[in-house]
Design a protein with these regions (language model features):
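Non-catalytic terminal/accessory segments
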Residues: 1-415
Length: 415
């Protein structure tokens, strides 16, 4: 980068370069300017200097954010994702990097989303253990959090952790950046922070830290919770307590400009062999896992009993099945067997690593479908394998020679 001059804002150049490295590592699609990461890197030094120069002088104004509809994680409908330009992503990452060391020490230990050293499966595990200790759960659904969060309160929580002028300036500008839809129309907004931006996760966590986490710890210290971004579960000792806490949370959300979804926020009874009471709701979904009564086996005695356990949710299973179908594995006869495995394994292993942590047998039908698609692929690729007898012999030989060729063979080898 060229030599710096005095600027109103002291933003270190190495910070901009590190922000670029993080953006480059995540890759991602181009924004409204249609500039890809590769095109940005073709003139990297000048592009990074331009970002630093404009941010340091206070003259950086974010372009519109490209609006893209994407399926919600774990098969929960669709939401609008905001895709910033590569340059804007780097600028946002600079601010996120400034805020993260300030806010991380403040955050509640049961806030799991978008935080270093924490993951969704950590939240699932904590929830699993607490469902054994607490009989009741409040399954919270904050309605359209990322679309409705109030800008003035977002700025207020940022001001609570820093008085850095350039951070506050650019947070305000990013909040006000319009969405550009596929037809080119611009949607001006007066609230919300688009998902997909580099700075949204830290802003969302900071907002909910004050709006929910800290408030819960102060008002209801005996009701532990797990929160991943705007998805949260609260544990209670009795139905009466759960109803009271739910109503107080709803009131708190109204105070900060949010709403609990009236239909999706539910009180659930964690019934099992030792908790035989009845309630209209005995299951809930959290981070792609369906928690409900399931058959379990005592490892020491072999005794069967009912436990309240998580497993891949029907919605997540359908989303994975739809993705599997869309891959059209049986049509990829242009690939060799080894190349097919290299292409397919990261996808299947991703499902197994996440959804197979608990009650993995719920995934077996999906993994058997992978084998069925492989059978169809083999029949199209090799004419001699079109009869079942010949295919079965080939399959058995392949399993013996290369037992680790396909990721799902660790758990399921039949079809």
């Amino acid at each position: 980068m060229p030599k710096p001059k005095d600027k109103p804002f002291a933003i270190p150049k190495p910070m901009v370069r590190e922000a670029y490295r993080r953006v480059a590592a995540n890759k991602g699609a181009p924004g409204v300017d249609e500039v890809t990461l590769g095109e940005f890197e073709a003139d990297l030094e000048n592009n990074l200097y331009r970002i630093w120069n404009r941010m340091s002088s206070g003259s950086y104004f974010p372009p519109p954010v490209r609006a893209v509809e994407i399926p919600k994680p774990h098969g929960g409908g669709v939401r609008v994702l905001g895709v910033p330009t590569i340059a804007d992503r780097i600028a946002q990452t600079v601010v996120a990097m400034y805020l993260e060391p300030l806010v991380e020490p403040r955050f509640h230990p049961d806030s799991y989303g978008y935080r270093p050293g924490k993951a969704a499966l950590d939240a699932v595990e904590t929830c699993r253990r607490r469902c054994w200790k607490f009989d009741w759960v409040i399954d919270l659904d904050v309605q359209e959090f990322f679309d409705t969060v109030r800008w003035d309160l977002v700025v207020k929580v940022v001001e609570a952790v820093t008085d850095c002028r350039w951070v506050l300036l650019y947070v305000k500008r990013w909040l006000a950046a319009p969405l550009q839809h596929p037809d080119g129309t611009l949607q001006e907004r007066d609230r919300g922070t688009p998902q997909g931006s580099a700075v949204s996760p830290v802003l969302a966590n900071l907002f909910l830290h004050y709006a929910f986490d800290q408030w819960m710890a102060r008002k209801f210290p005996g009701c532990p919770f797990e929160r991943y971004a705007d998805d949260a579960v609260v544990h209670c000792k009795s139905r009466r307590q759960a109803e009271y806490v739910r109503d107080k949370i709803a009131q708190r959300m109204r105070e900060v400009g949010l709403r609990l979804h009236p239909d999706k926020t539910r009180i659930v009874y964690c019934c099992d062999s030792s908790r035989r009471g009845e309630h209209e709701q005995a299951s809930f979904t959290f981070l792609g896992y369906a928690f409900r009564p399931r058959e379990a086996v005592n490892g020491r005695t072999g005794e069967h009993f009912t436990s309240f356990l998580p497993a891949i949710s029907p919605e997540a299973l359908k989303a994975a099945s739809d993705r599997l179908r869309a891959l059209r594995i049986h049509r990829r006869t242009d690939l060799s067997l080894d190349d097919l495995a290299r292409w397919l394994n990261p996808i299947v292993a991703g499902w197994m690593n996440y959804y197979g942590r608990y009650y993995r047998s719920e995934m077996y039908p999906l993994l058997r479908r992978v084998s069925l698609y492989l059978r169809r692929w083999a029949g199209k690729k090799y004419r001699r394998l079109r009869t079942y007898k010949r295919f079965k012999r080939w399959w058995a030989g392949l399993l013996k020679r290369e037992p680790g060729l396909f990721a799902h063979w660790r758990w399921v080898r039949a079809f």
